[in-house]
Amino acid sequence: YTLTTMATIKPFKGIRPPQDLVEQVASRPYDVLNSAEAREEAAGNEKSLYHIIKPEIDFPVGTDEHDERVYRKAAENFRMFQDKGWLVQDDKENYYIYAQTMNGKTQYGLVVGAYVPDYMNGVIKKHELTRRDKEEDRMKHVRVNNANIEPVFFAYPDNAVLDAVIARYTAQKPVYDFVAPDDGFGHTFWIIDRQEDIEVITKEFAKMPALYIADGHHRSAAAALVGAEKAGQNPNHRGDEEYNYFMAVCFPANQLTIIDYNRVVKDLNGLTPGEFLAAVGKNFTVEEKGTEIYKPAGLHNFSLYLDGKWYS
């Protein structure tokens, strides 16, 4: 791979549902629910994307989701969805805008092909360690489908030029616009198909020294590793083949909200609240913050809620 120092992206021919089927096809991400929940959500809906991203639901309850047959089923279903016209590939390479509305707040993301060498060279910044077993699971999924079924989420530095392009498209009628029944989140989608706009977006990203993974460390690692693997297997590798790119939705930093990632501890293991706080105090500086909700103020700062009180 050639060394990259700025972000490289490209438009791509998206594979997506027709307008009238999008609500039936759309699903939550693969990693926010278990097999039983996916089975329940997809019940009676043969068009649900869960048949591709959680294909174990098409097998008897208790089937190991890492069984080779399950991965093969994902590929079989992906082909079937295309054969039946539930997923259709666009004729030309586009960028797309995907907006999510949560609790009254909307964030607008650019859907792009991110560049594998950018991941390898650190232009795409990571902030989580990944587990090899989870990488391997997603790698098998990418390999067997020869596609990125789900995008990763990136943050990019605020950019007025991109804001203006996005504002122009989002003022128009969207291709998709629906509210998901399970969580009430709004999903809206536009296609950026004008060549001049596509070139402007590519050029603006080429000025960015870094993109940041907001969500999807394992999917990013898997896509990049499979891309590198395919490059190694191709004696005529040029660097512009499709496998050098993976699907990412990029949100400007000013629109991203960092949501709590909380953990519930069910009991104090026989300790009183005072003893528990004293034990925590051996490794942390503990400070009482009162009854109002307290959120971490910086790196290595945690908040703790115990017996009606907040602690830093």
Cite the ranges covered by each PLM segment.
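Surface-exposed, charge/polar-rich loops and edge strands
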Residues: 5-312
